[in-house]
Swiss-Prot record:
Cofactor note: Binds 1 Mg(2+) ion per subunit. Binds 1 [4Fe-4S] cluster per subunit.
Family annotation (PROSITE patterns): GATASE_TYPE_2, PUR_PYR_PR_TRANSFER
Enzyme superclass (EC): transferase
The protein's role, per its UniProt record: Catalyzes the formation of phosphoribosylamine from phosphoribosylpyrophosphate (PRPP) and glutamine.
Active site: C11 (nucleophile)
Organism: Pyrococcus abyssi (strain GE5 / Orsay)
Entries under SUPFAM superfamilies matching the protein: N-terminal nucleophile aminohydrolases (Ntn hydrolases), PRTase-like
A Pfam family it matches: Pribosyltran
Cofactor(s) recorded in Swiss-Prot or TrEMBL: Mg(2+); [4Fe-4S] cluster
Listed name of the protein: Amidophosphoribosyltransferase
Domain of life: Archaea
Similarity field: In the C-terminal section; belongs to the purine/pyrimidine phosphoribosyltransferase family.
Domain Glutamine amidotransferase type-2: 11-224
Length: 447
């Protein structure tokens, strides 16, 4: 099945030390399903590591028998990629230096290739092509020398560069860590046990007290007790696209609620680039919250002008024509847009092909004018820290002016949120915006 490559989150992770750990991990992964729909896995400890994983949605990979595995400790993972063999679905089991672990990783390493060559030169054999394996080997290599989880992770922080929030199942313990910059989110929860998740929305169902794992912080969960230490400090740079697109709206990351940040993006956009319109509509679902903010600030009524078909899933056999794909996923409400000046709000434009189809769809439904407003700045650069953004050549804003993009998509007007407006909306300057500015955090490339 052909896949149109767009901008996607790499994955989500979940871990728990508590009774009925496997079933709780299953529920947690379902809550993180938006972060990856192409593969899932759970690793447990009951005297040894056992891993169940497969391609597909969480509900497709696990059955009742697998959920009945007896264990009070488990980690899990959801991934987006359709490429690679089952051996590359996480958690990965890694064996090195006389030890073994299972590891789940959200992010991307920037020095994966030189590190892999280093360890291969030491005679260590790799069993996958994913960068996650390097983290596991780095940890086991250093642990074999120091016999201490914290010191081993301190050395990992010095050696491994890039974006990584990780959960490691090792010797009956869970080790959780977030890279010193804090690119990718990770949350700790405490209640009837100890929990970790990429987003706090995946922990809320368990009634826990939660907090962010700090950048450079490491947890070691050992039965009914835990210890945590901040082992490395760098200038924080939280991925801005977690707030723009990837995280669930009901999540709070780094003390900032995602829904409120997206709503403020719409407010800032309306202030910076007002439009004369009769109705504000969103590209569902990602543009909805910003569209509500835009409508409130502009005084233009918000209505649902595009309806999303929620039953086109991962296994749907897509037609070859791009236009038909968009029409299968989205349908205009003619009565909402016919004869109207429509303000269309979305979170971002990657290539521009989908937006072109949507604008035409609205015109075919009778829209008199279509004014496109994008609740983020233009994406001009690729991401090397865990978001699958296409190459720069494929990014329409990398090589075309905003006016050229407007003509390409067929809109009457086009405006993006500014960098400063985005910072105001999110409410922190500690953001990685490399895909928007081309300014990559120094630590991730200092090797």
């Amino acid at each position: 099945m052909a896949k149109v490559r767009g901008m996607r989150e790499k994955c989500g992770i979940f871990g728990v030390s508590s009774e009925d750990a496997v079933r709780k991990t299953y529920y947690g992964l379902i809550a993180l399903q938006h972060r990856g729909q192409e593969g899932a896995g759970i690793s447990v400890w009951n005297g040894r590591i056992r891993t169940i994983k497969g391609h597909g949605l969480v509900s497709e990979v696990f059955d009742e028998n697998s959920l009945n595995l007896a264990s009070n400790i488990a980690i899990g993972h959801v991934r987006y990629s359709t490429s690679g063999s089952l051996s590359e679905v996480q958690p990965l089991e890694v064996r090195c230096c006389g030890y073994e672990l299972a590891i789940a990783h959200n992010g991307t390493l920037t020095n994966f290739i030189p590190l892999r060559r280093l360890y291969e030169g030491m005679g260590i054999k790799f069993h996958s092509s994913v960068d996650t394996e390097v983290i596991g080997i780095s940890f086991l290599n250093h642990y074999s020398q120091v016999k201490d989880e914290f010191e081993a992770m301190r050395r990992v922080f010095e050696e491994v560069k890039g974006a990584y929030s990780i959960l490691i199942l090792f010797d009956g313990k869970i080790i959780a860590a977030r890279d010193p910059v804090g690119f990718r989110p990770l949350v700790f929860g405490e209640g009837d046990g100890y929990y970790f998740a990429s987003e706090d929305s995946a922990l809320r169902m368990f009634g826990l007290e939660t907090r962010d794992v700090l950048p450079g912080e490491v947890f070691v969960i050992d039965g009914e007790s835990y210890e945590s230490k901040v082992l490395a400090r760098e200038k924080h740079a939280y991925c801005v696209f977690e707030y723009i697109y990837f995280a669930r709206p009901d999540s709070t990351l780094n003390g900032i609620n995602v829904y409120c940040a997206r709503y403020r993006m719409g407010v800032e956009l309306a202030r910076e680039s007002p439009a004369e319109g009769d109705v504000v509509i969103a590209v569902p679902d990602s543009g909805r919250t910003a569209a509500l903010g835009f409508a409130h600030e502009s005084g233009i009524p918000y209505m649902e002008g595009l309806i999303k078909n929620r039953y086109i899933g991962r296994t749907f056999i897509m037609p070859s024509g791009r236009g038909l794909k968009v029409k299968l996923k989205l349908s205009p409400v003619r009565e909402v847009v016919n004869g109207k000046r429509v303000v269309l709000v979305d979170d971002s434009i990657v290539r521009g092909t989908t937006m072109t189809r949507i604008v035409k769809m609205l015109r075919d439904a009778g829209a008199r004018e279509v004014h496109v407003r994008i609740a983020s700045p233009p994406i001009r650069y690729p991401c090397y820290m865990g978001i699958d953004i296409p190459t720069r050549h494929e990014l329409i804003a990398a090589w075309r002016s905003i006016e050229d993009i407007r003509k390409e998509i067929g809109a009457d007007s086009l405006a993006y949120l500014s960098i400063e407006g985005l910072k105001r909306a999110v409410g922190t300057k500690n953001l990685c915006m490399a895909c928007l500015t081309g300014e990559y955090p120094e630590w991730a490339f200092n090797f």
